[in-house]
Each structure stands twice: as structure tokens, then as C-alpha cells.
Amino acid sequence: MTTSSEDVLLQMGEVRYKKGDGTLYVMNERVAWMAEHRDTVTVSHRYADIKTQKISPEGKPKVQLQVVLHDGNTSTFHFVNRQGQAAMLADRDKVKELLQQLLPNFKRKVDKDLEDKNRILVENPNLLQLYKDLVITKVLTSDEFWATHAKDHALKKMGRSQEIGVSGAFLADIKPQTDGCNGLKYNLTSDVIHCIFKTYPAVKRKHFENVPAKMSEAEFWTKFFQSHYFHRDRLTAGTKDIFTECGKIDDQALKAAVQQGAGDPLLDLKKFEDVPLEEGFGSVAGDRNVVNSGNIVHQNMIKRFNQHSIMVLKTCANVTSAPSTMTNGTNNANGPVSQSAYTNGMNGKGQATATATKSSSDQVDKDEPQSKKQRLMEKIHYVDLGDPILEGDDSANGEKAKSKHFELSKVERYLNGPVQNSMYDNHNDPMSLEEVQYKLVRNSESWLNRNVQRTFICSKAAVNALGELSPGGSMMRGFQEQSAGQLVPNDFQRELRHLYLSLSELLKHFWSCFPPTSEELETKLQRMHETLQRFKMAKLVPFENRAMHELSPLRSSLTQHLNQLLRTANSKFATWKERKLRNTR
């Protein structure tokens, strides 16, 4: 099971791994698990490969210990001592405490920068191949590669952080547990608290005002779950309830949202009325003047559901809105802002409310024609008929063009498209009837004057003609691309594709240096020219030598275009160098 140099520090029986019972061994340099009635180790992890260990939360029926490796894999061990839950916890704690002492001695310091670079290379296969072709072959150094050629990928990865949405049932997911004293215990995680703050900014503001100046974190959330704000079915609120103002703020926000509408100018929420199914099975409207006399508790419940749905939808809208958009009357946790920029809450009353409502309605009236036009275009626009041509203002078209953002996940999937067939080329040079008749007459004059004598050519000329008509000959240049695609093996095609990818990346940075108007650009131009020369000697010349031995008819045609690109770059660099020397004299 173990080598002679290993000592078993702890042997723990009745440990289950993947539904199999066995024994867990904690040794000097690794942790191992062996199934019952076996003499071979099933699971073995060296301490240097272990990133961290995790244990199951308290109160869970299963007592588990999980080992997380640096490569992301995990191994979970389930302790199943027959003596009960207390014995399971004791066994788990023994293993956990021993691992806590051993793991720091074998802690492998992993550079976060290296992990990020490795993740970028794994997520971008083309960049990984470029790294292999340029860095491993010593055409470029690793620092130059990451500073120049992989800079865009690194910045894109940093700026691609996506906002996590809010679930509509996040409050229902908070399952209370009894504490044994006629009380309830809520287990709040950081994600749930983030969802509450994001959906109800008024609660976030109250949290900033009261924690930790007036109460602790636990006391605040206890008051939140005991408050009238959380239990909306209560008819009266407590006098000491700190969330009473939050309910009023939400009511004002609900009225403003109903007045503003659902963002669809063709839909009017204020025209919706309750029609019982008994009235003609819902097809015949009843008396519109009759006031709904339903249970007020039910009405408050429906009102609360609508309010919650509006707030969840606003969290999605705030992600794409401008940074200047405020929530709950504050732009951050530091203080209030003006009343005209609120979303869910305000500081003043009365006149401030009217001002905010007026400004909001003015904004709605201002944007209504544009939104109605966009909504109508969505109704009459069909994708298969193409984009409609509108005779509108240029500003609307400009804003529409700016709002389009298209990012390609896999660029190679968009590089292949339909190829035009030369058999169906349209010639736009019509000829008149007189011209056609004239050409027919001239051609028909030579039909009867054909020479019937047969002339034979020598065998040498025939062999030369066959050579010219063979693949690679002068007469087959028009079909060279098609024949080359059929004759070149797959490994050569793959390597040639990698050469084009690497050379295109180098040439992109080479040509971006022109015109070299600064010393920095001149230094980069000189460096890129030297890099191109190293690329030719390290990658292109070995490929040509290999093609010369294995693909004799196509040895010169495969790299002809690559050499032409390099010659053009060298010629441009030589011209710039000569001009620079002439100016310095």
C-alpha cells in the first residue's frame, strides 16, 4: 500500500467514498483511501497537489470532508461511524485538524498571474497555438507575447465580468428553522443579502444608517424579518419599526411604475380591470363602476407580488443603464442625491414627490414617440425580409447603430462562407443583333476551309506537353489551388494554417508601427523586424525544407504567399531605414 519511507499518521475506518466503504489513511506526504477487502489504494492525493479542504456545514445529516486540488478536481469522504453523529463528527475533526497541520508544510505557492494566463490560453485555442509557435520556439519572449499579442485578450477577460441576476424566488429560498424555543432561525448567505440589497435599495439604505452605529448585523436582520415591511399581510405596523418608511417608499415607486407603464406604448396597464369568470365566462364585461370588494389582505398580497416583480425587473434594467442612474435616492452608501434621479425611494415628501413624478412623466412623454416607433417596427418587421428602409432622422439611426454590439465567440466559424460559382457569372455586356450576326458570318466563312491533313508531333514535344499539363506545370496554374488542396496532406495543411496565423499576428503589429512618428514606435518597428527574421528562420525555413523532401511538386507553391508577405515587409522596412539615414545626414 505505501512505500517504506511513508508512515501512517492516522488511520480512520468507516469512511465512505463514492458509495463504497473503506479506510482513510493520513500519511507523511499524502492522504489515501482504500476500499474494504482490497490491498490497493483507490484514491491518493499528495499534499502538494491539495489546494484546500472543506467540511460539511453543521446540522447536515451527512458528515463529509472534501479535498480540493489545484486542478479543480475534488474528492469527498463521507464518515459513517456506527456509533452515531457525535462519533462521525469526532472522526472528521481528527482528520481535519491533522490536515490543517500538514498542508501548510506542502503548500504550493501558485502565482495568480500565472493562473490567469493559463486560463486565458485554455479559453482561446488560437492564442494557445500562437504561444506555441512564437514563445516556445523563442521567436518572442514570454513578456513580449503577453505585453503585445495577448494584451487584447487579457483586457477583454478583465472587462467581461457579468452581473449576476436576481432570482424572483430568492426570499422563498430562505427556509427558516426552529431554534427549539418557539423561534425561527434564518440562515442568510452573502448572496441572499446581496439580492435583498439589490432588489430593495431602501433596505440597503437602512442597513447603512443603522449598522453598526445603532445595532449589530444580527439585530438588523432580526428586525427585518420581524418587521411589517417583510410581513405585509399585517394591517398595523409597529411604532418602533424602522422599515415603515421603506413600505411607503415602495408604494410610491409602485404608483410611479404604473403611471410610467410597462415600457410598451401599445399597452396601457391602467385600463386593466378585474372581470370574474362568472360574468359570461369572462367574455362579457360587468359593471365598470362597481368597486371591487375583495378581501383587503388578498389585495395587499397581490400588490406585494406586483411590487416584488417590478423591483426584480428593475435590477435587470439597472445593469444596462448608465452609471448616473440612482437607486433609492442614493448613488452609493454615502448620502442622498437629487429627487429627480430616484428609482426606489426619496428623502423628501410632498413637493419633492410631485417634482420627481413630474420629471418622470415628462421623460416618459419625451421618449414615447421614439419607443412607439420602435414598437411598431417590431410588429411589422420580418427577419427573412431584411431590415426595413426608413426615412427618419439620422440621430435615431446613429443611436441604433451604436447600440449594436457583436462579439464573436469562435471567429473561425464566421470565416467560411458561400463561394460564387463561376458557371453562373452574370456578364453585363449585352450585344446588339447586328453584332451577333456579323460575328456569326465571319466565323462561318472559315468552316469550309479547314485543312484535312493530319500533322504528327515528335515524342519529345508530346512528353513536354504532358509535363506542362500535369499538376505543377505551367498550363495548370489556373487549377493549382484546387489541385494543391487535394494533394497536400492534412498535417501540412494544419501546420500551414498555424504559420499563417502566427505571421499575420506579427505583421499586424509590424504594419501598425507606420508611420513611426515617435521613438517608441521606431523601437517597436526595429524589434518587430527582427522578430520577423527570427520567425522565418525558426518556423518558415524548416517547413519549406520538410515540404521539399515530402511534397516535391508543391514545395515552392505552398510558401510562395508567405514569402511574398515577408518580402513586402522587408522592402518597407528597408525603404524607411534608407529614408531615415538620408534625413539624418
From Swiss-Prot:
Q: Does the keyword Transcription regulation apply?
A: yes
Which residues lie in Basic and acidic residues bias regions?
363-374
Q: Name one GO biological process term.
A: transcription by RNA polymerase II
Pfam families from the UniProt entry: BSD, PH_TFIIH
* Disordered: annotated segments: 324-374
Q: Which domain of life is it from?
A: Eukaryota
Print the keywords alphabetically.
Answer: DNA damage, DNA repair, Nucleus, Repeat, Transcription, Transcription regulation
Q: Where in the cell is it found?
A: Nucleus
InterPro entries xrefs: BSD_dom, BSD_dom_sf, PH-like_dom_sf, Tfb1/GTF2H1, TFIIH_BTF_p62_N
Q: Which family does it belong to?
A: Belongs to the TFB1 family.
State whether it acts alone or in a complex, and with which partners, per the record: Component of the 7-subunit TFIIH core complex composed of XPB/ERCC3, XPD/ERCC2, GTF2H1, GTF2H2, GTF2H3, GTF2H4 and GTF2H5, which is active in NER. The core complex associates with the 3-subunit CDK-activating kinase (CAK) module composed of CCNH/cyclin H, CDK7 and MNAT1 to form the 10-subunit holoenzyme (holo-TFIIH) active in transcription.
Protein name as catalogued: General transcription factor IIH subunit 1
Organism per entry: Drosophila melanogaster (Fruit fly)
Phylogenetic placement of the source organism = Eukaryota, Metazoa, Ecdysozoa, Arthropoda, Hexapoda
